[in-house]
């Protein structure tokens, strides 16, 4: 399986000067609280939060929300008109691993407005077997076809890409939890 760092379609934006480890620690504790309260989907990767986590009114979530939005602007090289924006989190490990084939998804069926997606890796366990293969897997030609690849996860970065591309979380490689923040925004 091929692995890339980024390219002209799957782009990364560095927020290490804005988002701190304390922000990440706060977000992880908040996500654990959401999961512990039972507010997660049962038909998604275990555990995926139900609520729009960007709607939380806390300075930490504002940093994540605004950094994602600014990443989208950077992606286009200009400010663009946006619509609905939402985010959720995955808290996954080997014990909660699901059938990999059911996890593929995209927004290609939505022609207008266009959608952009983003992924922020909050925490990847230190004991993963291969860090390059623990982020997100993409299938630009569809899940049944050749050309699949992984994008290497980078700490303190947003990975931004058009939502029309098939994607899924990489298989968990640790019994410890991996925390991922995922977001979508409409572009008008």
Regions found by a protein language model. Give the residues of each.
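Non-heme Fe(II)/2-oxoglutarate
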Residues: 1-81, 101
